[in-house]
Amino acid sequence: MIIMKGYSMEIEGNHAKARIREADISLKDSVNIAHHLRGMPLSRAKEIIDAVINKTYAIPYFRYLDSVSHRPGVGPGRYPVKAAKAFKQLLENVENNAEFKGLNTDNLVIKHIAANKGRMIKKYTPKAYGRAGANFKDLINLEIIVTEGSE
């Protein structure tokens, strides 16, 4: 039996939450995107994610910097398009949840955002002489909590 844990942070007052479980995206890209968006107004975060998908804005990397090239005006950074599409879905979902709860969607601020390692899919590829090579894929859980605040 799997006992599901809730969100990793509980907030008092008016807030909205959203979560994506077991997304097939890179953990390293997701951690860096979440770090960059934390504390940002939701409208600005959506603009940044759209620009990353169009490859006009690079996400600055603060972790997993090995062989990450510098981008103009950013430092080490990349354009993680696949992870950005998952974050776009997450941001739209939390905005709809906030609208349903009656919050003012123009003043939403990202209070908490996290990317955590989820379930691992184990695959084995047959090789020569009866051996098998392991191919493990980590799935990622994303969560976000927004509150009403001033920009």
Curated annotation (Swiss-Prot):
GO terms for biological process: cytoplasmic translation. It comes from the Archaea. One of its GO terms (molecular function) is rRNA binding. The keyword RNA-binding applies. The keyword Cytoplasm does not apply. One of its GO terms (cellular component) is cytosolic large ribosomal subunit. Keywords: Ribonucleoprotein, Ribosomal protein, RNA-binding, rRNA-binding. This protein binds specifically to 23S rRNA. It makes multiple contacts with different domains of the 23S rRNA in the assembled 50S subunit and ribosome. Belongs to the universal ribosomal protein uL22 family. Part of the 50S ribosomal subunit. This is Large ribosomal subunit protein uL22. It comes from Thermoplasma acidophilum (strain ATCC 25905 / DSM 1728 / JCM 9062 / NBRC 15155 / AMRC-C165). The gene is rpl22.
